[in-house]
Amino acid sequence: MNKGSKADKLHSRFAFIFAGFLVCVAVVIVAGLVYFDNQARPSATPNAPETYEDGFVEVDWDYWKSVNPDIIGWVNVEGTQINYPIVAAHAEDPNYYLKHDIYGKYNPYGVPYLDADCEGNIDAQNAVIYGHHMNNDSMFSDFSNFKDLAYVEEHSPIYLQTPDKKMKLDVKYVDVINANQGGKYTNFDDLTSFVTWYQDQLDKATLVVDKYAQPTHVINFCTCSYGTFRNERTLVCAADPASPHILVANPEQAKEVTNDQAA
């Protein structure tokens, strides 16, 4: 009985120590995630309270340019967690910002970034901006909800700004795609090529919000989503209503008007 009692006590002590070890590991993991999350949520005005004007968050551009010269914009969407800087990816390491934050430090949250093919130009005909979909709904997670029209209407416009201008973007369409299929286009030979591409995307889209106003420049916000495909992405295609548009009733008209403009 004494031997059994000692063995039981030893097992209990081991179980207690192991449980304590697991708790410590869990605390370290949670602390690490909290740290990464905090680093991935920089304030637009680090030295002052965050303020908004006409929906746009006020950004201290001088400060952020001194922190990271790759910063080119800031995006926020009212009623969501989307409120982040945007950096420009570089051709020599196009996926760098998938795992690095605005401070250039390793961070699994990354930071939203403009596709390297756009060469830092947010006015590229199809400017593609990527952001992670995190389990805590941070980063671009809320964009995956835009496939629902009611959600789009409740969370529009998308506020996007650069050091030089501010844009209230209207959502044109939302598409849920398999990232393993299809190509990516950011720049086109001419306006006709862009219109042809845009109308093709519109025809295939999961949700069409505006089928009559043909933009001449769009911004696609891209994030992972988890529904139909194994490697699924949600694309939220938006445009500045203040930028040039071609008002048409159907795709063929769009091509005709564009050809007339090019002539």
Where are these regions (language model features)?
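Solvent-exposed, non-transmembrane regions of membrane-associated and secreted proteins
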Residues: 26-263
